Amino acid sequence: MKQVRDVMNTDLITIEANLTFDNILKIMTEKGAGKLPVIDNGQLVGVVTRDDILVRQETAPLPPVIAFWDLLITLPENKEFKKKLKKLSGYIAKDIMSTDYLVVKQSDDLANVITQIVEQKYNYALVVENDSIEGIITKTDLIKKCFN
C-alpha cells in the first residue's frame, strides 16, 4: 500500500502572512510555484494559489495571465490589467489566501487521499505532521508519478 510520503513533494516554498502581493508574485514567477502555504507565528494558516490571485474579488486581472497546469503564461499587458494589478499590490498574503484546503499525514493511504482530492474537488493536499508543513501533493505530482 502506497502512502502519502511515497509521492509528496517536499521541495516546498512557504511564505509569511504579511508578505506583500508584489513579493508573492515575484516568488511565484521566479520559482514557478503555484501554491504557497502561508505561515503565521510558526503555524499554517492558509495557502496562496495562482487562482486566489486571479479571482481576487472585483480586482482580479482578466487574463493576460493564464494558468495551465503548473505553468503561468503571460499574455501582452494592457492598461486595464496594469490598473487592476496596481490595486492588488496593496494586499498581503493573509488578505488573499485560501483557508479551505485538504490536510493529510505522511502515513495516510495514498488511494484514500486521491479519493478525497477528487471527490472534494481539491487540486492539492498539504502534508502536515506535528503542526509542521512537510510537503504537498498536487494533481500534477500524481500524474507525473503515474508516468515515471
Predicted regions and their residues:
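Acidic side chains
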Residues: D6, D51-D52, D95, D141
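Residue-level detector of secondary-structure transition/capping positions
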Residues: T29-G32, D52, P61, K121
